Amino acid sequence: KELPFDGEIMLHEELAKKREDKEKLDKVRRTALDTDPLYVLFTSGSTGMPKGVVGHHRGVIDYIDQLSAVLDFDEESVFGNQAPLYFDACMKDIYPTLKFGATTWLIPHELFLFPVRLVEYLNVHKINTICWVVSALTMISAFGTFKEVVPEYLRTVAFGSEVFPIRQFNLWKRTLPQVRFTN
């Protein structure tokens, strides 16, 4: 079913040319609540009915505060983003960057097909923190990438979403004994 739209369409290119309206911005800042929506994540509809799940400011703030404390994120963190920006897993890279003034590199997705080039990219950009799905990590170790190139700057590897095969996990741990691995 198509819903009618009666809002105003705004283009970034046009908005960027306008001067900021200090009064409007001040009003938003005065009236904003931590329960105000921040984003809507639309599901695929695997239950038969697609739906949007609303994430609010307080939920993201609390999540990032706790994640940052556990994984020791700070202004020196250099994230290598693997998750698409339309997927909520990207919050682990994007929001700590905003919180601390850290750095996030949006890794081109095609590099995940070429493990040696992917690790070279990590080294060129001095990426020290990755929060990736296990399949991305396993692809690097399973193809013998560490025989050619090793991530030089990693200090934190956070992973989840699937079981990390113990053989591959141990290969990562042996190759990078100084790195903190967190599931």
List PLM regions with ranges.
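Carrier-protein-dependent adenylate-forming modules in NRPS/ANL systems
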Residues: 1-59, 71-72, 101
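Alpha-helix capping/helix-boundary segments
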Residues: 2, 135-137, 164
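Conserved ATP-binding loop and adjacent catalytic segment of the adenylate-forming AMP-binding
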Residues: 21-27, 106-113, 130-131, 177-183
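Short hydrophobic/charged patches on amphipathic alpha-helices used for structural packing
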Residues: 29, 116-119, 146
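Conserved S/T- and glycine-rich ATP-binding loop of Class I adenylate-forming
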Residues: 37, 43-46, 79, 85, ...
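Short hydrophobic "strand-cap" motifs at the C-terminus of beta-strands
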Residues: 40, 82-83, 107, 132-134, ...
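Conserved AMP-binding/adenylation subdomain of ANL enzymes
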Residues: 51-80, 88-128
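Gly/Ser/Thr-rich phosphate-binding loop
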Residues: 99-102, 127-131, 141-183
